[in-house]
A protein has these predicted regions:
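The catalytic Nudix box helix
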Residues: 33-66
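Short, charged/polar surface micro-motifs in flexible loops or helix N-caps
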Residues: 12-17, 25-27, 39-40, 68-71, ...
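N-terminal strand-loop-strand
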Residues: 1-33, 60
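Active-site-adjacent beta-strand/loop module that shapes the phosphate/pyrophosphate-binding cleft
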Residues: 4, 61, 68-85
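Detector for glycine-centered tight turns/loop "hinges" at secondary-structure junctions
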Residues: 15, 57, 75-76
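Short amphipathic alpha-helical surface micro-motifs
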Residues: 1-2, 14-15, 45-47, 64-67, ...
Length: 85
């Protein structure tokens, strides 16, 4: 069984939530929050900030921990509330 952890954020900018358009092999897969896999030795909060920057170009800071989302295939995501500055 494969287990993976990813972290991301609910990013707020000027009162709006940042969503990313997910497209895989030219197929629309919906709108998603920015998130990605934790690298070895990386803290969850650092992963969230790095992934927001990599996927959206936004520099943000963490306001608070929001929660965890678990998926059936043994992965889970950790989300933080972030504001862009």
């Amino acid at each position: 069984m494969v287990e993976a952890t990813s972290c991301g954020g609910v990013v707020i900018y000027k009162g709006k939530i940042l969503l990313l358009y997910k497209n895989f092999k030219n197929r629309y897969e919906g709108w998603v929050l920015p998130k990605g896999t934790v690298e070895e030795g990386e803290e969850h909060a650092d992963t969230a900030l790095r992934e927001v920057k990599e996927e959206s170009g936004a520099t943000a800071h963490i306001i608070k921990f929001v929660g965890t989302s678990r998926y059936n295939f043994m992965t889970y995501s950790i989300f933080y509330l972030l504001y862009i500055y």
